[in-house]
Amino acid sequence: MDTSDFNFKFLGQSVLRYQVPLDVYNTINHIYETKYPELKPANKQLVGKIEKEHSLFYDGENSNKMTKHNHLPQDILQWFHQKFIHYLEWNKVTEYNTHLNSVWINTMFEHEYNPVHVHQGMLFTGLSSVMILKLPQSFGVEYSSPDQPQNGRLQILGSSSGQFANVDYQPDIKERDF
């Protein structure tokens, strides 16, 4: 079958997975652990049902929920920027502006969760990411489906539809995943 006239347009969103370099991982953990008392709570601007949500970086508009601040060194901010540029280039996005808006840490405990939500940033097409800093030894008893555990799972939902479309992604997460 000749497919020389075939063209392809992906109607979903790509998910790329990186391993965080050890120095970036250690630096972020160290900042969180040593500066925790001075980190601003991020709960007011986040949807999570999580007690300990603290901001490491915010460069959005000042509001009653959050004001600009930065606890991250330039090399860490640059690492995030490089990953977002790689994502855009890998997806063949050629016209874009980048602006790192915020970096925060969620420390989750039993019965806490993040409901399904959308990250949009300043534009409709904002990029989102999740970095795994630490994981517990156990996520507790799986009550409903021990053969397909869901406790502690990250689930990324896509916006595509169709018979063969992938609509969600549940990676087996490890520390240093991004």
Feature-to-residue mapping (PLM):
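Residues at beta-strand starts and edge strands
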Residues: G12-S14, H99-N101, T125-L127
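Non-heme Fe(II)/2-oxoglutarate
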Residues: M1-Y96, H111-P115
